[in-house]
Amino acid sequence: MPKRIIPVSSGKGGVGKTTVATNFALSLSRFAPTILVDLDTGTSSVRSSIGVPVAHDLYHFFRKGRRLDECVTRLPDSWDPDGLYRGFGFVAGPLHLIEEVTNFGPEKKARLCDAINELPADYVILDMKAGLDANVVDFLPWSNSGILVFTPHLPSATLAASDIVKAILFRKLRIVFSPSSPFYAQVKDPRTTTLLVNDLLDEVEDVYEPGLPNLDAFLVDLAAALGDHPVLDQVARTVEHFRVHYVLNSFNGVDEAFDTAVRPFVENLVSTVSERMTLTNLGWVVRSDEIHQGNCRKRPVLLAPPDGRPASRPTRGERELDALIRETAGLAADPRPRKPVLPVPTRPDPESALARELDALNRMYHRRGNRDDPRDNFDYLTARALHLLGRARPSEFGTARLVGP
């Protein structure tokens, strides 16, 4: 049974999500058994990235009654002669588009969630479908974003990634203020109060109406309607405890990444969601011909020996893991004091959030040096992730268990 399930998603296709998910899962498998599950079922992206024979895939799980653990494909010895990635396996999507597998309903989705929860691995990485729909949202955690991937070269995907954050957080708030929630029973006149909360959430979500721009404005209106009420504190704490983790792909320097990817991402989050959330940059992957060539050969860059170096070289993550964990400890989100619920800013102000992200990006870049090897990038990303997995609560990074629809 997995200790942690981590989805990797993106607002749009073309940002290298599957490349990041595949190599991250491979790198993580050096430290603990890891299974990559291809939930981008319309394109079978993982199968296209790892060109090894697949005996059983999600088709056999849904149509032929195979258990999901029977659909795990391992690397052949010829691909991993030294057994460096013996802890890695993947579940491929179907070879061709099959409607009931690509657009599975609630019953099949619940069955798949249950099966993922029982996979024989410490870590399960989900390569999600690009974009945002029910077959994405239902596999995402409730209290954090999993890993979001975006790139300086596709601005529309950066903005769409912030929409994923909004969708997860609003789903969490609606669960908190639903009749089945424990909080519901603690509120005086719960039906009237939760109706008010959900009506105001509708206003924030409706981008076509010039109503409430974000959850901070939502708190202002809620305070005007309820006064000093425990609901305000519950909303504020739910937002504050939400964690956003992201990776920059096709990285080409701090200035470009910040101006064309990080800045619009943060500004959109602050203006349409809230400035109370905690953001964590897990690292980046440089733009690399090796990655492109590996994708063309259907052999991930971590499995392709670089020119002049053996494929079985010790990874930087293995040689320097303790040092990297000490290093990343100083790059975690600053322990800011809890914000008072009131007064709430009446106008979005992203500058403090932008300053924190730029400072973290600069410190990461200068501490790591100008490394242009994607292997080093994945080692670093993995070390950052392991640091979180060892220290953070399961609700802060990925999830311990999929709940399903």
Indicate residue ranges for each PLM-predicted region.
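Conserved nucleotide-binding/hydrolysis micro-motifs of P-loop NTPases
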Residues: 41-43, 95-98, 131-132, 153-156, ...
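Inter-motif core of Ras-like GTPase G domains
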Residues: 117-121, 135-155
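Conserved beta-strand segments of the P-loop GTPase G domain that flank and frequently precede/overlap
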Residues: 37, 92-93, 148-151, 247-250
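Walker A/P-loop phosphate-binding motif and the immediately C-terminal alpha-helix
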Residues: 2-41
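Conserved C-terminal guanine-recognition region of P-loop GTPase G domains, centered on the G4
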Residues: 116, 133, 158-174, 228
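Conserved ATPase-coupling elements of RecA-like P-loop NTPase cores
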Residues: 101, 128, 132-139
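C-terminal lobe/tail of nucleotide-utilizing enzymes
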Residues: 182-405
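P-loop/Walker-type NTP enzyme "switch/lid" segment
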Residues: 39-118, 122, 191-199, 243-245, ...
